[in-house]
From Swiss-Prot:
Name the UniProt record assigns to this protein: DNA polymerase III PolC-type
HAMAP family: DNApol_PolC
General function of this protein: Required for replicative DNA synthesis. This DNA polymerase also exhibits 3' to 5' exonuclease activity.
Gene: polC
Cited InterPro entries: DNA_pol3_alpha_NTPase_dom, DNA_pol3_finger, DnaE2/DnaE/PolC, DNAPol_HHH, DnaQ, Exonuclease_RNaseT/DNA_pol3, NA-bd_OB-fold, NA-bd_OB_tRNA
Alphabetical keyword list: Cytoplasm, DNA replication, DNA-directed DNA polymerase, Exonuclease, Hydrolase, Nuclease, Nucleotidyltransferase, Transferase
Span of domain Exonuclease: 358-513
Gene Ontology biological-process entries: DNA-templated DNA replication
Source organism, top-level taxon: Bacteria
């Protein structure tokens, strides 16, 4: 911003003149106003094209105002006034009609306005009351409301937090003026953010529901922090400045206000029976917990959950409602498909097609509602004996002019109808043409209901005839994507016709019907009554779903709902998950079925003119009938007249009373408060929803608000009370409290699992440690076995043991993850190689056993070599000192989470093995729910900005983003998780099932619920795919060495974690002081930096580094500082969660408290004052206490030991079998291997590495390329080389060892890929290639591949074509 002071122009004296090009504003401050100022404003506006604000007020250019009025008003005075406020142009329009007209004109004149207005101008429309003379010109009168730009508040001193007190007039974020100093703004806090730096800043985000504002606290952060929180209503006072193009309040004082909440003050509360949450696929923004919290605040006794098409929120909803003391009602708003509708209706005789007379008809109408719209054209064709024998056609003059839209659709203009007969004259004549014929039409309900209703209106007759729908016939007899008349005609090859003219449509529909009659005869249908057989062949994907609410009444109903939901996703998913009406009828026990919104079957039929008897027949299917406030209108019904909707709801009420059905008023809730509507609009904006801005009032209403809406419809307080309070409560009383999940494990049953686990454990224990067992081993084994068996977890151990043994027997090692290495039983069963006993020696011959209690040794592998003092044999070294409590809790009752890393090549076989053990219908993939992440939510809001043309402030964008974040987007599956259903249960006892992401080609079913929600009820086996076991398998195949037999104390292997000496390379040329390139968990730049700083000398220190690198806020800003400051050594800092418990017990703390502190810290919850006090009493060092406070997540030691063990084995091969290591590495991890670059040598590799490392941000591919090139450089520096691919020698995928070199495989050639590479090997195995021509003929190689091969010498001296010689 440029600022000039003490300036003079003509007779105008300036205090200052500031130019802000980013905001497009010139700020002028003068001593006093004069006539010359107007000239100055015009001059500055002309020269700068910016808005000019004098002393905080924009002196708008009269010419500009006139141009805007001329451009937008035209000949009609829609705009009363044009006002500039900061960067906003406010157009004051005369009424709602004028607002709509000007909104339309703003879009069409955008280009001209952009040229007139300064950059960044936001245009707002404000409806004002038209003057009396304009009211006479039929400009609609708006609601009488005044929206003051500021309000006076009475502030109590005790609510003042600090600094300046509020000014007399207080603004809200949507009503503020830019550049007003000493401004007070009132709003609700929705976010607080603290930014640390040279200067600490506290950002407070305020909103009034219409707009939002960032308030910055600079010098008084400590006075504010902890005094205000999200949800508080405050008045912030300070300087309102324009920062980065938008207003920002620099806070100098804050006062807290009591929140003016909407509250339910009714003595008897209602029950909400229709509400959607963020689990309704990208449609609602209601948070489950906030929904329950609001219901509790309002005193609702019960609330329902009815998400679109799924029940995934049920577990979260139940937990929240239970805690709040509210009855949860589980349900769904289903996409119901009526597969039981008749093809022919009102059939009274059983004629054959040849005997019956049919009239095929089509109407053109002024709209879709027979109650209010009129027939303007009739076209009809009569069929007898399979032949067209007569036609009828007429245009009809309606009682009022037809709309432009109707003319566009039908091609019929008002002029064409002016001299035509009325419906009163036409109908008797047309009935004479019909006689006793059977009606035929395409989408026959529409035409039939129009005809029947107008016969009643005009002639007073209750008229009914049999009628056949060719649309329903098409869905039974044809397979099409669309069943429109056009599509059917095209499929049957009946030629072009003039659509949307009645006689043309009737003629072609007659041809369609006759063709269908022939098709029916071929399948044995010759009589009218036999047409009902066609119902069984109707394609469910062709049927249009309608909404239907289903509530769970009891446990049986919950299971039935789960079955219905499962089938809707697995059998009947088409665009949406569809529930067939026939299946709902079959599984209806324990369910209550509601009619849902106006898009439901009943509402739709009523709007389409169904008779009372038809509506009664439809209503009989439902247990209760829903009505909704008039401002809750389905998005595709926004043009629906409210008076018409009133009539429909009143009619449905009468029918329900006649049938003794409950009528309930529901809210169709999609967000909690009226001001949240903009959040849902932003959610819908990028989804192609044309009407996203015009949000219906889909918020949660109080009892009083709902009663007011019911009175608006029924104009009767008793009925209002009945539908709002009494009936919803009666339905809630009919529903039992159902617990969806018991929160106790239901393990699968394996006969004698307890006994097998005990026997296998003891057998192995005796084999290793002798019989009798050493006391420490005996006590540990007994403690673990008792916890495992008594809590029913033996079967989990047995499953894992069988899986590991199967993999090992097939030649693939298995790595353990998580805390399972804390269990000695798991080690003895072979589930994990991690031994959790203290570091110890054991003799494999005489079973001598010795525990080493020496703080220098944190791992048994680090113990000095020693011979058995009893028999002289070399002693084995083992043990890592890991307490069992970290795995199964202090009481041994925590569900054991056994995670196993299988080779990626073997994972699918492991999954199939589990299915064989328990049966395919008892094993399901663990389901996940993918939601909109914060970054994606920003994209939604930006799309909203683009489509509305409204530039949002950063604060308002934050508010909308927070609403959208967490909305369900799709589903998926855990990478290796399998959920096991016990043999005596069905999956529907726990969860519905579905395909991941609704992909029928996935080949697997997942749990419908996110696996975390059912983890306590079902056994979850994590059989993950991982590169490391594949790496180990390949190394074993290449060297013949069993990786499980390598020495875990090999000094040269250990040395590469602190230097490059064992590799024999120059660290400067390698650009690394340590030799861990390519070693899992230790090859990244971050961990290599840790290795350089710590220079580990033992296996135990490697474990600590692994823990430190995997934790959050454990190394940086924590352990690293304590080491550098000299407070602790690497061996003393907190690196894994077990360190806390072990250290505190060593200090004398009671073990259960030590365990609680460990659990708190590992989850990032810090420590309580009581914990801190006890730690100080035991003289725990202050740095240790502070370290506990900083940690956000801690890695389990067992997991670290497992990772380091795998890494150490791979490192052993790198040191002692280098070419085998590099062959395995590049084969398995070399996705970004570039043969062209690598074959150029080390200098080319170095150049590319410098380029990559200079990039500020690298994606996953670039990071992988860096890793691959680092290992390639290292290999070359160690004296090895790469050989180019060779058409006669290379493998498809594997790097092959040739002398001191690696032969590059075919799949590493750019653009070639596995499929082409494998085709080369197959062809080569059949017979050698004789020419390039032969190569291309017998493989998938193309010309581009050939050119690349030639450039790299892959083809050698292979001739271009076949060469034949006689001699």
């Amino acid at each position: 911003m440029k600022k000039i002071e003490n300036l003079k122009w003509k007779n105008v004296s300036f205090k200052s003149l500031e130019i802000d090009p980013d905001a497009g504003v010139v700020l002028v401050s003068v001593e006093k106003f004069s006539e010359e100022i107007e000239d100055l404003v015009r001059l500055l506006e002309k020269k700068t094209r910016f808005r000019v604000i004098v002393n905080g007020v924009q002196k708008s250019n009269g010419d500009l105002r006139g141009k805007i009025l001329s451009l937008l008003n035209g000949n009609v005075p829609y705009i009363k006034d044009v006002v500039f406020e900061g960067n906003r142009l406010i157009l004051k329009v005369l009424g709602d009609f004028a607002r709509d007209r000007i909104a339309s004109k703003l879009r069409s004149t955008k280009k001209q306005l952009d040229e007139l207005l300064p950059p960044g101008t936001e245009i707002m429309l404000e409806v004002v009351e038209p003057p009396e003379d304009l009211l006479k010109k039929e400009v609609p009168q708006p609601e009488k409301r005044e929206e003051p730009k500021g309000e006076e508040l009475k502030i109590e001193d005790e609510n003042h937090i600090f600094g300046q007190k509020p000014r007399k007039i207080v603004f809200t974020p949507s009503k503020i003026f830019e550049y007003n100093k000493k401004t007070s703004v009132k709003g609700k806090i929705f976010k607080i953010e603290k930014i640390e730096g040279k200067r600490t800043v506290l950002l407070i985000y305020l909103t009034d529901g219409e707009d939002s504002l960032i308030c910055k606290v600079f010098n008084d952060v400590e006075k504010v922090e902890g005094k205000v929180s999200v949800g508080d209503v405050i008045v912030a006072t300070g300087d309102l400045l324009l920062e980065n193009g938008e207003p920002t309040l620099y806070v100098k004082g804050i006062t807290k206000l009591p929140e003016a909440k909407r509250m339910d003050k009714s003595p008897v509360k209602r029950v909400e029976l229709h509400a959607h949450t963020k689990f309704s696929d990208q449609d609602a923004i209601t948070d489950v917990n906030e929904y329950v919290k609001r219901a509790k605040e309002w005193g609702f006794p019960a609330i329902a959950l009815t998400d679109h098409g799924n029940v995934q929120a049920i577990p979260y909803f139940y937990d929240a409602a239970k805690e709040a003391g509210i009855k949860p009602i589980f349900g769904i708003e289903a996409y119901l498909v009526s597969d039981v509708e008749p093809v022919i209706r009102n059939l009274s005789d059983d004629s054959t097609f040849g005997d019956a007379t049919f009239v095929v008809l089509d109407f053109e109408t002024t709209g879709l509602d027979p109650q209010v719209d009129e027939i303007i054209e009739i076209g009809a064709v009569k069929i007898q004996g399979g032949q067209i024998v007569d036609e009828y056609h007429t245009l009809i003059k309606p009682s009022r002019e037809i709309s432009r839209k109707s003319s566009e659709i039908t091609g019929i203009t008002q002029e064409m109808l002016e001299n035509k007969r009325s419906i009163e004259e036409v109908l008797p004549e047309f009935l004479g043409f019909l006689e006793d014929s059977i009606i035929v039409a395409h989408n026959a309900n529409f035409d039939y209901r129009f005809l029947r209703l107008w016969i009643k209106k005009v002639m007073g007759l209750d008229w009914e005839r049999p009628y056949i729908d060719t649309l329903a016939l098409a869905k039974s007899l044809l397979k099409l994507r669309s069943y429109s008349l056009d599509s059917v005609v095209e499929k049957l090859g009946l030629g072009p016709f003039r659509h949307h003219r009645a006689l043309d449509d009737a003629r072609v529909t007659a041809q369609v019907f006759l063709r269908f009659v022939e098709m029916m005869k071929k399948i044995g249908i010759t009589k009218l009554s036999e047409m009902e057989k066609l119902k069984d062949t109707i394609d469910y994907t062709a049927l249009k779903p309608f909404h239907c609410t289903i509530l769970v009444q009891n446990k049986k109903g919950l299971k039935n709902l789960y079955k219905l939901v499962s089938d809707s996703y697995i059998k009947y998913f088409y665009g949406v998950p569809r529930i067939l009406k026939s299946e709902l009828i079959e599984n209806r026990e324990g369910l209550l079925v509601g009619s849902a919104c106006i898009s439901g079957e009943l509402g739709r039929a009523a709007l389409e003119g169904a008779s009372d008897s038809e509506l009664e027949e439809i209503a009989k299917f439902y247990d209760y009938i829903e009505v909704m406030p008039l401002d809750v209108i389905a998005e595709d019904e926004e043009d629906l007249d409210r008076e018409r909707l009133k009539e429909v709801y009143r009619k449905l009420y009468r029918i329900a009373k006649k049938l003794n059905k409950f009528v309930v008023m529901t809210g169709d809730v999609h967000f909690l408060d009226p001001e949240d509507a903009r959040g849902r609009a932003a959610l819908l904006a990028p989804q192609g929803n044309r009407n996203f801005e015009n949000q219906p009032a889909l918020y949660l209403r109080t009892t009083e608000e709902m009663l007011e809406k019911a009175i608006e419809i029924f104009e009767d307080e008793e009925i209002a009370r009945e539908v709002v309070i009494e009936n919803p409560n009666r339905i809630a009383d009919m529903i039992e409290e159902v617990q969806p999940l018991e929160k106790k494990l239901h393990p699968p049953i394996i006969e004698n699992a307890d006994e097998i686990v005990r026997n296998l454990t003891m057998k192995r224990a005796y084999e290793i440690y002798g019989d009798p067992l050493p006391e420490i081993v005996q006590k540990r084994v007994e403690k673990e076995l008792n916890a495992i068996i008594n809590h029913g977890y033996a079967v989990l151990y047995l499953i894992a043991q069988e899986l590991v043994q199967k993999s090992m027997s097939d030649g693939y090692v298995v790595g353990s993850r998580g805390s399972v290495g804390s269990s000695l039983v798991a080690n003895l069963l072979g589930i994990t190689e991690v031994n959790p006993l203290p570091p110890h020696y054991r003799c494999p011959e005489c079973k001598y056993f010795e525990v080493v209690e020496d703080d220098r040794y944190g791992a048994g592998y680090d113990l000095p070599n020693k011979n058995c003092p009893r028999c002289g044999a070399p002693l084995r070294k083992d043990g890592h000192g890991i307490p069992f409590e970290t795995f199964m809790g202090f009481e041994g009752d925590k569900v054991p989470d056994i995670d196993l890393n299988f080779s990626g090549e073997y994972q699918e076989r492991a999954h199939r093995f589990v299915e064989e053990l328990f049966g395919k219908d008892h094993v399901y993939r663990a389901g996940t729910i993918n939601t909109i992440a914060e970054r994606s939510a920003v994209g939604y809001v930006r799309s909203y900005e683009e489509k509305t043309g409204k530039k949002l402030r950063k604060a308002e964008m934050e508010r909308l983003v927070s609403m959208i974040t967490g909305v369900k987007r799709t589903t998926g599956q855990h990478p290796g998780g399998l959920m096991i259903i016990p043999k005596d249960k069905e999956v529907y006892d726990f969860t519905p099932i579905q395909y991941p992401a609704n992909d029928r080609n996935a080949g697997v079913f997942t749990t419908h619920f996110a696996y975390e929600t059912i983890h306590d009820d079902l056994v979850k086996i994590d059989a993950l795919g991982h590169d490391d076991p594949t790496f180990i398998k390949m190394l074993k195949d290449l060297t013949g060495i069993d990786p499980m037999t390598i020495p875990m104390d090999d000094p040269d292997t250990l040395a590469i974690f602190s230097s490059v000496k064992p590799l024999g390379v120059d660290p400067v040329e390698l650009e690394s002081d340590v030799g861990t390139y390519g070693i899992p968990e230790f090859g990244t730049e971050f961990v290599r930096g840790m290795l350089v700083e710590t220079r580990p000398k033992s296996f135990a220190e490697l474990v600590r580094i692994s823990g430190l690198s995997h934790g959050t806020d454990v190394w940086l800003n924590n352990a690293r500082d304590w080491i550098n400051l000299g407070y602790a050594k690497l061996s003393e800092v907190i690196s894994c969660r077990d360190d806390i418990m072990n250290f505190l017990i060593h200090k004398g703390m009671e073990p259960s408290l030590a365990f609680k502190i460990m659990e708190n810290v590992r989850k990032g919850k810090g420590i309580t004052e009581e914990m801190e006090s006890e730690m100080r009493r035991l003289k725990v060092p202050e740095w240790f206490i502070e370290s506990c406070k900083r940690i956000k997540y801690l890695f389990p030691k067992a997991h670290a030991v497992a990772y380091v063990s795998m890494a150490f084995r791979i490192a052993y091969f790198k040191v002692h079998y280098p070419l085998q290591f590099y062959a395995a590495y590049f084969t398995i991890k070399g996705d970004q291997f570039d043969p062209v670059l690598v074959l150029r040598g080390k200098e080319a590799i170095k150049r590319r590495l410098r380029e990559l490392k200079a990039m500020p941000a690298k994606d996953a591919q670039k990071k992988n390329e860096v890793s691959v090139l680092e290992v390639a450089l290292e290999m070359i520096l160690r004296g090895f080389s790469f050989l180019p691919p060779d058409i006669f020698k290379s493998d498809a995928k594997k790097f092959l060892i040739e002398g001191n070199s690696l032969r590059i495989p075919f799949n590493k050639l750019p653009g070639l890929g596995d499929s082409v590479a494998e085709s080369i090997i197959r062809a080569r195995e059949e017979k050698p290639f004789t020419s390039v021509e032969d190569l291309m003929k017998r493989t998938k190689v193309n010309k581009n591949h050939i050119e690349l091969m030639k450039s790299l010498g892959v083809l050698g001296d292979l001739p271009e074509t076949e060469q034949f010689t006689l001699f």
